[in-house]
Swiss-Prot record:
Residues 11-24 have a biased composition (Polar residues). It comes from the Eukaryota. Its main location: cytoplasm. The gene is STS1. It is found in: Cytoplasm; Nucleus. Involved in ubiquitin-mediated protein degradation. Regulatory factor in the ubiquitin/proteasome pathway that controls the turnover of proteasome substrates. Targets proteasomes to the nucleus and facilitates the degradation of nuclear proteins. Coiled coil: none annotated. The lineage of its organism: Eukaryota, Fungi, Dikarya, Ascomycota, Saccharomycotina. This is Tethering factor for nuclear proteasome STS1.
Length: 318
């Protein structure tokens, strides 16, 4: 007979089993043992199956679900790291908002700011940026070279003009005595600032040029103040090269021509300075002092007129 699948107990096995019982030797059929082990293994696997549901099919790696307490949650940046990523405008706005909500910290912030030493070049770079913003705000349909910009251009350009003039006045006041002891540096900075204002595009209507003219008047007062400081320090006048003072006077004369005579007063003060010998310098002291006194009287009269008149509320020079 050929090979048969499965195991069927034959008569020989039964007979041998019966005969062996008499001798006391018990014989266990091999096929029956294998079946029992197979069934037992299957039952054990079925019992362990619910406990091993999380076993991965590939590689046999356990895929246990992590407990909620072991999850890594995202969190915002620390204050220092966040401020490192903020740009200049965001930092400025943050500081302004804090001072608005908490006015008590304004004095502390102001004390820290005025204690910083800002270079003149940094101030000039900022002024040039704001001056460029004025030119960029000019409408495309009009050219500023003709100095005949209309009312529409004035409305468009007014915010940038006021921002530039306010910044210019603040920087000038921070770079003259007693804030800055170097008189030559103050004069040079004032010279550049005056040039920036003179070159600004003007408007066809005279009333739209009010802010420009008011600014030039204030610059005239600053020029007179610096000339007064130079007149008091005779050592500077005698030790320095006269060409330096003549250069300032020449440039001031050009600015006066472009401003329709608004800088005439400091120009006359410059001309009253004698850069020659000590005797000549002492002879011009009286005339210079008289000019300075007249200058202060003029400033006082102008301030009284401004206080009595109705000046614009958004002007940076009132």
């Amino acid at each position: 007979m050929g090979f048969e699948w499965g195991f069927k107990p034959s008569s020989k096995i039964t007979q041998s089993t019966v005969s062996s019982q008499g001798t006391g030797n018990v014989m266990i059929p091999t096929a029956g043992v294998k079946q029992k082990r197979r069934y037992a293994n299957e039952e054990q696997e079925e019992e362990e199956l619910p406990r091993n549901k999380n076993v991965m099919k590939y590689g046999g790696v356990s895929k246990r679900r992590p407990q909620p307490g072991s999850l890594i949650r995202g969190q915002p940046l620390p204050l220092q790291r966040g401020m490192e990523l903020m740009n200049k405008n965001q930092l400025q706005q943050l500081l302004v908002d804090l001072m608005t909500k908490h006015p008590e910290i304004q004095q502390s912030v102001h004390t820290r700011v005025i204690g910083l030493d800002f270079s003149i070049q940094k101030c000039l770079d900022m002024l040039k940026q704001k001056s460029e913003a004025v030119y960029q705000s000019i409408p495309y349909n009009r050219s500023y070279e003709s100095n005949k910009l209309d009312d529409y251009a004035f409305v468009r350009m007014k915010p940038q003009i006021l921002e530039f003039l306010n910044c210019l006045v603040d920087f000038i006041l921070d770079n003259i005595p007693p804030r800055l002891e170097n008189l030559h540096a103050s004069l040079k900075f004032l010279d550049i600032c005056t040039e920036l204002v003179i070159k600004l595009p003007r408007f066809e209507l005279a009333s739209n040029n009010y802010y420009y003219d008011k600014c030039i008047e204030q610059l005239s007062h600053v020029w007179c103040t610096l000339i007064e400081h130079x007149a008091r320090d005779r050592i500077i006048l005698l030790a320095d090269n006269s060409s330096v003072w003549k250069s300032h006077m020449t440039r001031l004369q050009v600015y006066n021509e472009h401003s329709n005579g608004l800088l005439e007063r400091p120009l006359q003060l410059f001309k009253s300075l004698d850069m020659g010998s000590p005797s000549a310098a002492s002879s011009s002291t009286l005339s210079l002092q008289e000019s300075i006194i007249y200058h202060h009287d003029t400033m006082t009269a102008n301030e009284n007129n401004n206080n009595s008149g109705s000046a614009a509320t958004d002007s940076p020079f009132n």
